């Protein structure tokens, strides 16, 4: 990332397996607790892959501080079309360097955040499970302020004629 306050997306792809209607889910929720140094930037969506159809309406999206939840609606969970698909959950975020301390090395410094999300599904028969995504690292390297090829010139002022002279 080129700027320590840049916006970017966290995306999570997950497969929902084919299920017989007797084993449909009673609940299915993707949850991401954003790490310190990252703030929600006001956009979350869900796409079905590979078609990239927007299926955001199949989920109730809520935020509470740094926690973003995608809860599948009961209407979606009761449809055969929900199962046997791959979904991509998208969360637009922004780096917030005021929440983390950079790591300094030589003439540069680096902001780094690590994140992972979970998916928890429960079948109508009560069996439930939670899976975690791999951890992803996002970073931004910046360089310490340098003044290159600077020179100092001395100026004097003659108060009577109001002119600055080198």
Regions found by a protein language model. Name each.
Residues 1-22, 114-116, 125, 130-166:
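Serine/threonine-rich, low-complexity linker/repeat segments that form flexible spacers/stalks
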Residues 4-5, 36, 83:
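Surface-exposed loops/turns
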Residues 7, 28, 33, 77, ...:
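Extended non-catalytic domains of envelope/secretory-pathway proteins
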Residues 9-11, 66-77, 166:
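Generic recognition of long tandem-repeat/solenoid scaffolds
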Residues 12, 24-26, 32, 76-139:
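Serine/threonine-enriched low-complexity regions used as flexible
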Residues 17-18, 35, 96:
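Sec-exported extracytoplasmic/periplasmic mature domains
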Residues 25-72:
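A surface/secretory-pathway sequence property marking extracellular, secreted
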Residues 53, 65, 69, 85-90, ...:
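...the same signal can extend to comparable exposed beta-sheet modules
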């Amino acid at each position: 990332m080129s700027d320590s306050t840049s916006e970017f997306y966290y995306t999570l792809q997950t497969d929902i397996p084919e299920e017989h209607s007797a084993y449909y889910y009673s609940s299915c929720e993707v949850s991401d607790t954003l790490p310190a140094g990252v703030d929600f930037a006001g956009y979350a969506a869900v796409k079905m892959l590979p078609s990239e159809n927007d299926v955001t309406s199949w989920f109730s999206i809520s935020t509470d501080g740094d926690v973003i939840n995608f809860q599948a609606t009961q209407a979606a969970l009761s449809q055969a079309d929900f199962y046997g698909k791959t979904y991509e959950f998208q969360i637009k975020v922004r780096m917030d360097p005021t929440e983390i301390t950079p790591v300094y090395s030589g003439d540069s410094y680096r902001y780094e955040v690590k994140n992972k999300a979970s998916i928890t599904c429960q079948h109508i028969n009560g069996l439930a499970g939670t899976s975690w995504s791999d951890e992803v690292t996002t970073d931004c390297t910046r360089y310490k302020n340098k003044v290159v090829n600077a020179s100092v010139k001395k100026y004097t002022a003659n108060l009577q004629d109001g002119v600055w002279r080198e």
